[in-house]
């Protein structure tokens, strides 16, 4: 009789049967087209369909193709924004979305091929880009009309803030159009963005080169943002808010000409330092929500600025031992030179760091000045929107060789941020004040990129999600109670 082969397990070898779990017995079967990694696309489809987003953008942007076939301008913009919401980082990400058969069946718009999308983006000129902003205003108005009365009144009549800021997007390739070396030494494009702070919505944007100064275009951003707010039904006088990078008389004048008030950071110059030292000690008031900070008003008014401009001053007490020894430290620039020298020599126990705001808002009392300073400090809201566009969507890349295509890519990211804000506002994921919304990356994890099986049976379509607490059913229930825009 032949003996069976002897099964040996050497010293460093383990039997497959001894591997924990099922790892040793798993085989890969045939692909299942009923599975999707992104079941949340149905929530975006409900939002886009009920608000009429594609149609609103079509009406505002107009026709971008001679033949009426394939995607319209609005459908293309929705598809691009949706792809970035679901993780597309470059044009090739659209091809991965197209490969998701079940997800495409749930989508309200078809995802174009990457080459088609890049070609469509080239068709957008200045008029079409202006139409995107017009469409945003129309859609924002529809969203506000569906909100509870208190939130609707707060957005339309309670206060409207236009924030201004820019960001650099590092790029590679010496032949890219509209890309230049920034002051940081990197080749970059520079999205210049205006947002409606209370609604968390981008209202206007330009794509500049890395070496372009954003200040000359700030007046246009303000004017276009005001038009967007008016289209959304805002009746209150808007306020323009910006950091020290927008310290320019023509920006303040543009804000006033557009029917806005302004609050802009002031560059630290000898005149404003002298004005700060003349503030009586008894004039200082404790700042809101900032430990060790005090607020006062000085009589400094920059030359050429609108009548009624005053300067609000904030100072923060700093221990001498906490001052950085690095002469490049930013905090050192906020301390008067005389105080800084004495503190570094050990002759003072503490100093004050100063910040300045030029505004035409009412700061006639100490309480009003404190309120204005606390509100101005919230200008960092726009940094959160830009961060979401870069790390939640894909504004961290400008993937094309032409400025036109990169500008449309930028708007895809900004529309993704807007769709995220509108979705959370209407689905009850926000806290009814604009402060409780998730970043797009978190929303992607919690709602959008959740795997599911698409089941069709007896004329019904069912999504089977993994076990556990899922948001999709709750979100769909809320969205489906909304009327369909016609």
Predicted regions and their residues:
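Dynamic "connector" segments at or just before major functional cores
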Residues: 1-187, 191-213, 218-232, 424, ...
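Short amphipathic alpha-helical "interface-anchor" segments enriched in bulky aromatics
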Residues: 47, 94, 369-403, 408, ...
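Short, surface-exposed connector motifs at secondary-structure boundaries
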Residues: 231-238, 257-258
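Short, surface-exposed basic-aromatic patches at helix termini and helix-loop junctions that form
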Residues: 252-261
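Basic, amphipathic alpha-helical segments enriched in Lys/Arg and hydrophobic/aromatic residues
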Residues: 396-464, 469, 475
């Amino acid at each position: 009789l032949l003996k069976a082969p002897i099964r040996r397990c050497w010293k460093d070898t383990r039997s497959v049967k001894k591997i924990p779990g099922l790892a040793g017995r798993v085989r890969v079967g045939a692909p299942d087209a009923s599975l999707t990694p992104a079941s949340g696309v149905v929530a975006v489809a409900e939002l886009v369909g009920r608000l009429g987003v594609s149609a609103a953008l079509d009406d505002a942007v107009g026709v971008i193709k001679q033949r009426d076939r394939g995607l319209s301008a609005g459908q293309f913009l929705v598809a691009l924004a949706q792809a970035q919401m679901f993780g597309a980082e470059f044009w090739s990400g659209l091809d991965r979305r197209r490969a998701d058969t079940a997800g495409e069946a749930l989508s309200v718009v078809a995802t174009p091929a990457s080459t088609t999308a890049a070609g469509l983006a080239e068709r957008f000129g200045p008029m079409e880009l202006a139409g995107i902003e017009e469409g945003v205003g129309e859609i924002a108005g529809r969203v506000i009309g569906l909100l509870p009365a208190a939130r609707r009144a707060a957005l339309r009549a309670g206060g409207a803030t236009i924030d201004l800021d820019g960001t650099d997007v590092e790029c590679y390739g010496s032949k890219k159009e509209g890309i230049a070396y920034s002051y940081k030494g990197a080749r970059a494009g520079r999205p210049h963005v205006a947002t409606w702070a209370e609604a968390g919505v981008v209202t206007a944007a330009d794509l500049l080169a890395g070496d372009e100064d954003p200040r000359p275009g700030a007046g246009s951003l303000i004017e276009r943002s005001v038009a967007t707010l008016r289209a959304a039904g805002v009746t209150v006088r808007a306020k323009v808010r910006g950091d020290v990078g927008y310290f320019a008389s023509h920006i303040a004048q543009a804000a006033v000409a557009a029917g806005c008030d302004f609050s802009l950071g002031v560059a630290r110059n000898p005149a404003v330092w002298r004005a700060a030292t003349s503030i009586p000690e008894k004039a200082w008031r404790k700042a809101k929500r900032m430990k060790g900070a005090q607020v006062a008003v000085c009589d400094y008014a920059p030359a050429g600025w609108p009548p009624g401009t005053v300067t609000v001053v904030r100072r923060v007490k700093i221990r001498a031992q906490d001052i950085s020894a690095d002469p490049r430290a930013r905090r050192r620039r906020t301390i008067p030179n005389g105080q800084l020298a004495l503190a570094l020599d050990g002759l003072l126990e503490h100093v004050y760091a100063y910040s300045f705001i030029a505004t035409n808002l009412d700061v006639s009392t100490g309480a009003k000045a404190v309120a204005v300073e606390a509100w101005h400090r919230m200008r960092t809201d726009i940094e959160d929107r830009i961060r979401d566009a870069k790390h939640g969507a894909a504004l961290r890349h400008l993937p094309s060789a032409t400025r036109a295509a990169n500008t449309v890519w930028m708007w895809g990211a900004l529309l993704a941020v807007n769709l995220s804000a509108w979705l959370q506002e209407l689905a009850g994921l926000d806290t009814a004040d604009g402060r409780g919304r998730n970043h797009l990356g978190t929303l992607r994890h919690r709602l959008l990129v959740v795997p599911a099986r698409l089941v069709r049976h007896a004329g019904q379509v069912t999504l089977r999600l993994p076990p556990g607490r899922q948001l999709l059913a709750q979100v769909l229930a809320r969205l489906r109670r909304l009327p369909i825009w016609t």
